[in-house]
């Protein structure tokens, strides 16, 4: 696999060092900035405005995972060093056996760091690479302002992709990329710390392809490109919809490069394998590093988590349960989305064949 092993090893080492560095940042200002807007960001019940849009927004917002991310950013145990924090990812919660992140974050802020009535949890099986930007941002801005900033970044990236695609005379790439966004509940992605990660990575990957496709293709560097995209997804994403960072760039590749059907099929398989090696390899690297250095038991925990998540869904076999969930998701979209679906299927398929 050429340079894959070296790229993975370097990525794991650099990723670990960067996490250690951000855990050296002072958390006091971060906590104060979170306290300023925690009430606005975690509204419940009568606190939610009465208008229909606000109700839709607050009903569907990913506050559960957003609250975990924010609290991970402001946690600091006085008897633990930066490396231990980066590997263990300590997290206080009001409950011992279940997670209540929204209530726990509110309590954490209101108690001014008094955690006597809270339970210490760990979340070691993920990299939590989002802390590389979330911690510095919370050092400077409130939680609400960070969300607005991410919203602006996403809009700017979408405009950049659109302009670049038009200039490169590849409007189909823009159509596939931005059209896909309609399937992601766009408003909710735009205002969610959790759900925006994979979308931002996807936009950056597509933009890089538009700018450097000729070089990547001529030098045969697309396998490494998809490897790196998989690595970045594994590092930054909090297990939301990671496959998007593979699927959309793949569609864009076949719009940018025409070849015989058999060659395209081989490339499809090869690029998927590259992305998968990057994604799984980077994730496994976290387990190995944490287990070897701190005996965290992360590998055992991860294996049991995988087993638990491949069991039946609602009494259905895993495969049938998966299709059932997809069906429920499709009910969330209006009828006109069928037109967008047809466009997304025909454009890449025509290029592939």
Can you annotate each of these PLM segments?
Residues 343-349:
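Conserved small/polar residues in nucleotide/adenosyl-binding loops
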Residues 268-341:
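Membrane-lumen/periplasm interface segments of specific transmembrane helices
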């Amino acid at each position: 696999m050429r340079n894959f092993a070296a790229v993975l090893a370097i990525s794991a080492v650099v990723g670990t060092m960067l996490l250690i560095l951000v855990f050296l940042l002072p958390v006091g200002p971060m906590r104060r900035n979170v306290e300023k807007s925690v009430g606005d960001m975690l509204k419940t019940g009568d606190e939610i405005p009465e208008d229909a849009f606000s109700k839709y927004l607050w009903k569907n917002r990913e506050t559960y995972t957003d609250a975990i991310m924010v609290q991970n950013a402001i946690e600091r145990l006085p008897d633990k060093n930066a490396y231990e924090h980066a590997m263990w990812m300590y997290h206080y919660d009001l409950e011992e056996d279940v997670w209540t992140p929204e209530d726990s974050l509110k309590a954490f802020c209101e108690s001014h760091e008094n955690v006597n009535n809270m339970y210490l949890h760990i979340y070691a099986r993920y990299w939590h690479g989002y802390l590389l930007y979330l911690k510095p941002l919370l050092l400077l801005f409130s939680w609400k302002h960070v969300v607005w900033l991410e919203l602006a970044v996403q809009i700017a990236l979408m405009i950049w992709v659109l302009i670049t695609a038009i200039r490169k005379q590849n409007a189909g790439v823009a159509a596939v990329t931005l059209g896909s966004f309609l399937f992601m509940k766009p408003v909710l992605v735009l205002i969610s710390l959790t759900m925006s990660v994979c979308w931002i990575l996807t936009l950056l990957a597509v933009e890089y392809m538009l700018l450097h496709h000729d070089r990547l293709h001529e030098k045969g560097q697309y396998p490494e490109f998809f490897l790196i995209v998989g690595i970045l997804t594994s590092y930054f994403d909090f297990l939301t919809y990671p496959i998007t960072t593979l699927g959309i760039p793949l569609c864009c590749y076949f719009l940018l490069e025409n070849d015989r059907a058999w060659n395209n099929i081989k490339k499809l398989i090869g690029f998927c394998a590259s992305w998968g090696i990057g994604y799984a390899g980077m994730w496994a690297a976290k387990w190995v590093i944490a287990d070897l250095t701190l005996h965290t038991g992360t590998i055992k925990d991860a294996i049991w988590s995988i087993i638990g998540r491949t069991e039946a869904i609602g009494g259905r076999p895993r495969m049938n349960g998966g299709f059932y969930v997809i069906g429920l998701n499709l009910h969330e979209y209006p009828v006109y989305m069928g037109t967008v679906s047809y466009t997304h299927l025909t454009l890449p398929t025509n290029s592939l064949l």
